[in-house]
Amino acid sequence: MTRIESTFETLKAQNKKALIPYVMAGDPSPNSFVDLLHDLVKHGADMIEVGLPFSDPMADGPTVALAGERALAGGTSTHQALAIVKKFREQDSSTPIILMGYLNPIEIIGYEAFIALCHESGVDGVLVVDLPPAESGNFVERLAAHDINKIFLLSPTTLPERRKQVMTHCGGYIYYVSLKGVTGSASLDTQAVGEQVQAIKQETNLPICVGFGIRDGQSAAAIGQYADGVIVGSELVKNFSGLSHTSRAEDIATAQASIMTKMDELRQALDALSA
């Protein structure tokens, strides 16, 4: 059983929903990022999605795209992102870490080398936005050999054939994209999302986690009624806007504190569902 699978099993036994924050590796500074990961866990994260900085992030909205630019400007590469995860693992051996990124940086490193680095660093899941499930079989198998889950996206516009392929190849959990568009998009129709999640649950036993458009405790709780977990990215990442790797430690700490305040709100809202 992988660390992701074990975490969801524990949450299910406790009748709890997974809170999964998304942060960009090395944003705003690689020096503060390990502390950020530990703080997210202290403030209720059940697992963490870590973005891999990339120069052409087609699915990222402006907030997350700017986070990637800040990380790249600070020198955070895919190799350094993995080194950060490895550093995090020195003190935390239980919180699952999922890498979310694009295919190009992985191909530059090489599939085998990338998977070996993930295993060595303690990565639990990989979500490659632009790797079609139909072309992922070999990659999925090689990840699985190291107890790493391959996560896939489903959205309101996913065609039936692709949906079937996702069900076949996905492990850990399914990331359901609640909105058409890019990360940080606006309105969230919780009833429509709920209907979609319930329909997906008829087709798979995998946990369903919903991301895109969750901004506060109210929207997290509304989605948490249907989903097994919620993923929150832009609402957290936006706190680092205007900062960089050259910013004062005090300014980064202030932004990080704002993120933790939001985490507390989200955690309390989700826990209230099982109270």
From Swiss-Prot:
Pathways involved: Amino-acid biosynthesis; L-tryptophan biosynthesis; L-tryptophan from chorismate: step 5/5
InterPro entries in alphabetical order: Aldolase_TIM, RibuloseP-bd_barrel, Trp_synthase_alpha_AS, Trp_synthase_suA
Catalyses which reaction(s): (1S,2R)-1-C-(indol-3-yl)glycerol 3-phosphate + L-serine = D-glyceraldehyde 3-phosphate + L-tryptophan + H2O
Enzyme Commission designation: 4.2.1.20
Protein origin, superkingdom: Bacteria
Keyword tags: Amino-acid biosynthesis, Aromatic amino acid biosynthesis, Lyase, Tryptophan biosynthesis
GO molecular function, one term: tryptophan synthase activity
Gene Ontology CC annotation, any one: cytosol
Similarity-based family: Belongs to the TrpA family.
Function of the protein: The alpha subunit is responsible for the aldol cleavage of indoleglycerol phosphate to indole and glyceraldehyde 3-phosphate.
Xref: HAMAP family: Trp_synth_alpha (MF_00131)
Oligomer and partners: Tetramer of two alpha and two beta chains.
Name used for this protein in its record: Tryptophan synthase alpha chain
Native source organism of the sequence: Psychrobacter sp. (strain PRwf-1)
Lineage: Bacteria, Pseudomonadati, Pseudomonadota, Gammaproteobacteria, Moraxellales
